[in-house]
């Protein structure tokens, strides 16, 4: 984060392989560097308690120029990782299901009604207090933080494993 705090994730390629390939590919390209968490919903607010980022425009409308297949149950893909505290999942449009690209959200608390509807693919293993702090920041219209919550640099350690480019769907 811009303030020096860190959020460390563990990714689960066996749960959502193409989603993980996509995330790693974007990280390696520096796509997420200097992007913001443009939407934050604390647990006390209606809606899923989460922080959302990964949009190069910072508006909630940006993407990498392509989509990926949604790896979740209602889209015909078995993904049993539930939306519990700390889980990371891909954001997408309501329709079509295959509309995820780069935006993701991290759960602040459990939200079972999202299970099977979004592609979960990892979990926060360090820095959940940073997620909580971001979620509690003062918000304006469309749950946008009044003070910018910027990801200064996003890195990935694949521990020597090569991950292929994701399978992409044209827009």
Give each language-model segment a name.
Residues 1-171:
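Cyclophilin-like peptidyl-prolyl cis-trans isomerases
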